[in-house]
């Protein structure tokens, strides 16, 4: 998820260079088209799908399409995410819920959709992109830090619950990486 640009695109490109077939999604067709163009420019044949990963029915439908059109999902990278840099007391509950929905609920929904096929295949890998904010927190990122902290624990629970099916689930908690999403913060805090 979230592999049209930025960290997700870099991860998918590295995986493609190791022989993986790349399948990605984004919430809008124009973003899928941009992603497909970027993969083509990089010499990678990728498959793109439009899907709102916070919508369980849409995710289940997308996973069915991918399995039918491309094949089994052996590796899932849950990378889609958003951040709202708003002081906590200025953030509305709706804004807080939106971040939790994309950064925590969506990885749950997508993992839940692919795990049955992974069990049937005899295993698989799930990689959740967490964040150093899951450990640290910082001003103006309360929803993001809460979501990534929850994702870290979800990762541990998936690993514990589905390891017996040869499904490994790991989290990666990168620090600040220069992407369009982190550009506003770099302007405010150039030292990270």
Tell what function each PLM region has.
Residues 116, 160-164:
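Alpha-helical segment proximal to the catalytic Tyr-Lys
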Residues 87-88, 95-100:
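Substrate-binding pocket helix/loop in short-chain dehydrogenase/reductase
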Residues 86-89, 136-142, 164-165:
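Active-site loop immediately N-terminal to the catalytic Tyr-X3-Lys motif
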Residues 164, 176-192:
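A glycine/serine/threonine-rich, flexible loop-to-helix segment
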Residues 111, 147, 155:
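Active-site helix of classical SDR
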Residues 131:
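Residue(s) in the substrate-gating loop at a strand-loop-helix junction
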Residues 1-22:
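Canonical Rossmann dinucleotide-binding motif of NAD(H)/NADP(H)-dependent dehydrogenases/reductases
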């Amino acid at each position: 998820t979230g592999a049209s640009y930025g960290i997700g695109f870099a991860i998918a490109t590295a995986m493609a260079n190791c022989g993986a077939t790349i399948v990605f999604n984004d919430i809008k067709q124009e973003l899928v088209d941009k992603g497909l163009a970027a993969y083509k420019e990089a010499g990678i044949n990728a498959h793109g799908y439009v899907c709102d990963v916070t919508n369980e029915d849409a995710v289940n439908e997308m996973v069915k399409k991918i399995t039918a059109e491309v094949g089994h999902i052996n590796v899932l990278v849950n990378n889609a995410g958003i951040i709202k840099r708003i002081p906590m007391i200025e953030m509305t509950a709706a804004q807080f819920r939106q971040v939790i929905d994309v950064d925590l609920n969506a990885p749950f929904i997508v993992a839940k959709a692919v795990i049955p096929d992974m069990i049937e295949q005899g295993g698989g890998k799930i990689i959740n992109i967490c964040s150093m904010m899951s450990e640290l927190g910082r001003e103006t990122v309360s929803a993001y830090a809460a979501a990534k902290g929850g994702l870290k624990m979800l990762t541990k629970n998936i690993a514990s619950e589905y390891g017996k099916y040869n499904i490994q689930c790991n989290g990666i908690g990168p620090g600040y990486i220069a992407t369009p999403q982190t550009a506003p913060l770099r302007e405010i805090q150039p030292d990270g």
